[in-house]
Structures are given as structure tokens and as C-alpha cells.
Regions:
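P-loop/Walker A NTP-binding module and the surrounding RecA-like catalytic core of P-loop NTPases
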Residues: 124-127, 146, 153-381
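Non-catalytic terminal/linker segments enriched in charged/polar, low-complexity residues
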Residues: 1-158, 178
């Protein structure tokens, strides 16, 4: 008998303790009637298995290529809209720097420095980019404005790609040898952590994985209730307990349930009280020990949710969580609502952390895998 069915009241939030349905009352046998000739049989239409249709196995190569091209075009348009504020801010500043410029001189580079810093790319990252530009100028590789623009674009892309790392967010399937694949989500309150977990669960589920959510933020009032709304909305089971419960105990129950039901991915919510770093560090360390005892290598990813609107404050949050939580990647939220999207480059350069996902809207599917090339192209085109 499956683990979560052994106790009637245990893991109620999985929604598996449904009442039995009464059998319908027996009816008297109908009276014998004269036989009626059956209608001629019509050939049944050929059915396409659901999995075959979803995976595109019922399509020709040309149809698959057309569908992929349409999806890529849709994603590109949505992403461009999301970073439009950052693009307009950066482009306007850079265009104003280059307007009327006929040659590359110290004054132009100083203005360019101010433009990049204003886009929240950050002082250290801006200095690095300009140093690369100056080397290109000294080598005569950069001798006009267009080559200067191309050099900046290339350097920003190089920074973002250099911080990339593989994980679930790389759109590869979850390794069969790991079950469940544990993703711990951290971040201060108010950055969109709960919303991100809901969207992340929906995305990973839509890729064919069985997902379970662990509501281990038992410190903040109504945290579990808010997560339960997203769990119901996405149809993903949730393990939760009353406020004040030891988060490690909630995680332990969730790990057991995930293994029993054969879940591919377990997404773990955590408390966001960064102001009490010592307690939070001890709590996260305990949770990591619990996860590691149940599944080798768990947690396999620790994603930090950062609000792009906060700009350089988000970079400082990332720096603090990197110390106490062993962050492996970033989810950048509210990218569609800020002109400070340059923070993605600053995080990648100064902390060496990959941007795994980007939140580009309010809808449940508005969480996309962060594509460095798409991001840089959207900023400059």
C-alpha cells in the first residue's frame, strides 16, 4: 500500500483521501423485448494517443519544425516585451552617447560608463566591460562606433554565458538515477518566491515530470495558505503542516511522500527572514542534512529568487544568501516591470551565478528559462 495511504489523516494536502462512492442500488431486470437488428458498424476513426500528440510523434518533420519555429517566435516576442523597459533605458542612454560621435575618445567612454552603471549593470562589471573595450581600441580591433557597440554586446553575452550551469532549468530531463530531484527555493519575503514556486511547478510538470511541493516556510503567517492556492491552481500536490512546525520535519515528511509516490521533482519553499541570518543558516543547514539523508546529493539545486526591481539591492541579497545557503542559481522575477534588468549581468559577473529562470509576467506560464543570447539581443536590437 502506498506510503501516503497508510494513515487516513496523514498528508491530507495530497488530496488522496477521497471518500468512497456508494454503489448504485440494483435495478430489476428489464422485460424481454423483441430483438432489434443492430445498425451497421462504421469504421472507428484512427485515434492518436495523448502522449503521441503532445510529444509531436504524430507530426511530420516539417510540421514539427514549423511548431518549434512558432514557439520560438512567440517566446522571443514575449521576452522582448518583458525587457523593453531596460532596453529603452539602456538604448536611449547609449544612443545619446553615440549621437553625433565621430570618433572614440576618453569623453565618449566616460559617458558610456555612466550609461552602463545607470542600467544597474554595476560598477565592477562596467569597469570590466570598458577595460575589454579599451584593449580592443589599443589593438586597433575597435575603430568605429558600430564595432564598439558590437564589442559591448559580445562582452555582456560572454559574462552571462560564462556563468551558465546545467540543471533542471537547462531543459534537460531529470536524471532517472535521482528520485526525487530536490530544488530548494530561497529568498527574502516580498520578492515573489511563492509565485515563482507555483510557476516553476507548473513548468516542470508540463514537461512530463511528477512534481510535489513542500511548504517548509512555517515561520511567515499564511505562507502555506498562499502556496496552497498555487498548488491547487497548478494541480500539483502540496505537503504542509501548521505554522511553527520545524521546517526540517515538514521536509522529512515531504521527502518520504515524494519517494513513495515516485515524484520526479520536489520543490521546497523556505523562510525568508534574512535579517536573522544565524537562525536562518542553522535552519537551512538542518534541512539540507535531512534532504541529504533521504536522497543522495539533495538538495540538488538551491535557487535564489531576486526581484529585478530592487536593482543593486538584489545583488547584495544574492551575496548574503550565497554565504548562508550555498545558492547554485538565480530566478530573476519582475523583469517585465523594471528598467534595472542589467542586474542579471552584475550577478553573473560578480557572483558567478547563472540566471536560471526569468519572470516576465503575471500568468502561470510567465516563467521562462533565461537565455543569455536572447536577453542581450533584446537589449540591443
Amino acid at each position: 500500500m502506498p506510503f501516503w495511504r497508510r494513515k487516513k489523516d496523514e498528508f491530507v494536502s495530497l488530496g488522496l483521501n477521497t471518500p468512497a462512492v456508494d454503489e448504485p442500488a440494483s435495478q430489476p431486470a428489464p422485460e424481454d423485448l423483441a430483438p432489434v437488428a443492430p445498425p451497421p458498424e462504421e469504421p472507428a476513426p484512427a485515434s492518436t494517443p495523448w502522449q503521441t500528440s503532445v510529444l509531436g510523434l504524430d507530426m511530420s518533420i516539417e510540421q514539427l519544425q514549423a511548431r518549434e519555429a512558432a514557439l520560438e517566435q512567440e517566446f522571443s516576442a514575449r521576452f522582448r516585451r518583458a525587457v523593453s523597459a531596460t532596453r529603452e533605458s539602456l538604448s536611449q542612454r547609449i544612443d545619446s552617447v553615440f549621437a553625433g560621435a565621430k570618433q572614440i575618445d576618453a569623453a565618449l567612454l566616460d559617458e558610456l560608463e555612466e550609461a552602463l552603471i545607470a542600467a544597474d549593470i554595476g560598477v565592477p562589471t562596467t569597469m570590466h566591460v570598458l577595460e575589454t573595450v579599451r584593449r580592443g581600441i589599443s589593438r586597433k580591433e575597435i575603430d568605429d562606433i558600430e564595432k564598439l557597440k558590437a564589442s559591448i554586446k559580445s562582452e555582456l553575452l560572454s559574462i552571462l554565458q560564462g556563468a551558465e550551469a546545467h540543471g533542471v532549468a537547462s531543459e534537460t530531463s531529470v536524471p532517472e538515477s535521482i528520485s526525487p530531484y530536490v530544488m530548494m527555493i530561497v529568498g527574502v519575503n516580498g520578492v515573489g518566491k511563492t509565485t515563482t514556486i507555483g510557476k516553476l511547478a507548473q513548468r516542470i510538470k508540463s514537461e512530463g515530470n511528477d512534481v510535489l511541493i513542500c511548504a517548509a516556510d512555517t515561520f511567515r503567517a499564511a505562507a502555506s495558505e498562499q502556496l496552497a492556492i498555487w498548488a491547487e491552481r497548478t494541480g500539483v500536490p502540496l505537503i504542509q503542516q501548521k505554522q511553527g512546525t520545524d521546517p526540517a520535519a515538514v521536509l522529512f515528511d515531504s521527502m518520504k511522500a515524494a519517494k513513495a509516490r515516485g515524484s520526479d521533482v520536489l520543490i521546497v519553499d523556505t523562510a525568508g527572514r534574512l535579517h536573522n541570518k544565524s537562525n536562518l543558516m542553522a535552519e537551512l543547514e538542518k534541512m539540507k542534512r535531512v534532504a541529504g539523508r533521504e536522497v543522495e546529493g539533495a538538495p540538488h539545486e538551491t535557487l535564489l529568487v531576486v526581484d529585478a526591481v530592487t536593482g543593486q539591492n538584489g545583488l547584495e541579497q544574492a551575496r548574503q544568501f550565497l554565504k548562508i545557503a550555498g545558492v547554485t542559481g538565480i530566478v530573476l522575477t519582475k523583469l517585465d516591470g523594471t528598467a534595472k534588468g542589467g542586474i542579471a549581468v552584475a550577478i553573473a559577473k560578480e557572483l558567478g551565478l547563472p540566471i536560471r529562470y526569468a519572470g516576465i509576467g503575471e500568468k502561470v506560464d510567465d516563467l521562462v528559462v533565461f537565455d543569455p543570447e536572447q536577453y542581450v539581443n533584446s537589449l540591443f536590437n
